[in-house]
């Protein structure tokens, strides 16, 4: 539902992502799952290649990236976000046009995926 609120045009998920048909997941989307197009793909690397082939700039959230606000996220972009436990695979990270990160203070190493995604989606929507 945060994606819908931020104005995203769709979601691409790998087949090993959370089960979007789980009743708790459906309820948590407050109906957004029925309004925002999504695709579940067998080959995420191929999906990233297809995005890039169609002129979509890809940004991967990565601890080794540049600060997300040091440049401009373009309107036609895709945000690549890893899961809570492992982050993005090196294969997917390497395919990104740019690695980006959110600045951290204190001893915190990372934000949870939902919060990080929300920050980046709203930056892309500016």
Q: Which residues does each predicted region cover?
A:
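RNA substrate-binding interface of SAM-dependent RNA methyltransferases
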Residues: 1-64
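Active-site/ligand-binding-proximal alpha/beta "capping" segment
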Residues: 59-107, 112
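Structured adenosyl-cofactor binding patch, chiefly the S-adenosyl-L-methionine
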Residues: 2-6, 20-33, 90-126
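Generic hydrophobic alpha-helical scaffold/packing signal
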Residues: 39, 45-48, 52, 65, ...
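Short flexible/disordered coil segments
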Residues: 53, 74-83, 119-126
């Amino acid at each position: 539902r945060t994606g819908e609120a931020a104005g995203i045009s769709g979601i691409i998920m790998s087949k090993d992502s959370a089960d979007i048909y789980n009743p708790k997941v459906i309820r948590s989307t407050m109906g957004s799952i029925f309004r925002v197009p999504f695709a579940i793909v067998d080959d995420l690397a191929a999906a990233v290649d297809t995005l890039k082939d169609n002129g979509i700039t890809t940004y991967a959230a990565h601890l080794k990236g540049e600060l997300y606000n040091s440049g401009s996220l373009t309107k036609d972009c895709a945000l690549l976000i890893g899961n809570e436990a492992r982050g993005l695979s090196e294969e997917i990270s390497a395919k990104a046009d740019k690695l980006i990160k959110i600045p951290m203070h204190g001893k915190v190493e990372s934000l949870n995926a939902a919060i990080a995604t929300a920050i980046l989606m709203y930056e892309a929507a500016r």
